[in-house]
Curated annotation (Swiss-Prot):
This is Nicotinamide riboside kinase 1. InterPro entries: P-loop_NTPase (IPR027417). The gene is NMRK1. It catalyses: beta-nicotinamide D-riboside + ATP = beta-nicotinamide D-ribonucleotide + ADP + H(+); beta-D-ribosylnicotinate + ATP = nicotinate beta-D-ribonucleotide + ADP + H(+). It comes from Homo sapiens (Human). Changing K16A: Loss of activity. GO terms for cellular component: cytoplasm; cytosol. CDD domains: NRK1. Keywords: ATP-binding, Kinase, Magnesium, Metal-binding, Nucleotide-binding, Pyridine nucleotide biosynthesis, Transferase.
Length: 199
């Protein structure tokens, strides 16, 4: 069974989770995996020379466990073809993976059917981050000393990506972002269904 996998990445507090949840509500046969669910325990997080916990790096995440969750979803999607409803039987299983470090993790490179990256300016990102409660809480200087520099490093690494990434303006309203991505996905899914019929 054909599947359709969407990546939604971007800077911290850019609206990735909100967008993923809104899409899940409106796309048939859709599941979401959130990278934030795969952080290692605080005791396993490295500290840099400034004393900042290194949460904004791949090493802070249990990516093997996340890959296992993706594989389980793909396996169950292949076996979920049994349906008495003709229309749902034709629906392509959709998986949205959302997280801040998706597109520079090589094992994921080949799975994306559509990739989106949310951006917001430094000041807006810092403002949004200051309104959120984190466990453990951000220490003074953490955003400027660790979070933003790691985002800039990640953006630089994305220059080497060989597939298409759609960049989104995270300062747009929740509704505008949803509509932009939803309309794009409906077109992409229609193409996939045509390919499925002709295959």
């Amino acid at each position: 069974m054909k599947t359709f996998i969407i990546g939604i990445s971007g800077v911290t507090n850019s609206g990735k989770t909100t967008l993923a949840k809104n899409l899940q509500k409106h796309l048939p046969n859709c599941s979401v995996i959130s990278q934030d669910d795969f952080f290692k325990p605080e005791s396993e997080i490295e500290t840099d020379k400034n004393g900042f916990l290194q949460y904004d790096v791949l090493e802070a995440l249990n990516m093997e466990k996340m890959m296992s969750a993706i594989s389980c979803w793909m396996e169950s999607a292949r076996h979920s073809v049994v349906s008495t409803d003709q229309e749902s039987a034709e629906e392509i299983p959709i998986l949205i993976i959302e997280g801040f470090l998706l597109f520079n993790y090589k094992p994921l490179d080949t799975i994306w059917n559509r990739s989106y990256f949310l951006t917001i300016p430094y000041e807006e990102c810092k403002r949004r981050r200051s309104t959120r409660v984190y466990q453990p809480p951000d220490s003074p200087g953490y955003f400027d000393g660790h979070v933003w520099p790691m985002y800039l490093k990640y953006r630089q690494e994305m220059q080497d990506i060989t597939w298409e990434v759609v960049y989104l303006d995270g300062t747009k309203s929740e509704e505008d972002l949803f509509l932009q991505v939803y309309e794009d996905l409906i077109q992409e899914l229609a193409k996939q269904k045509c390919l499925q019929v002709t295959a």
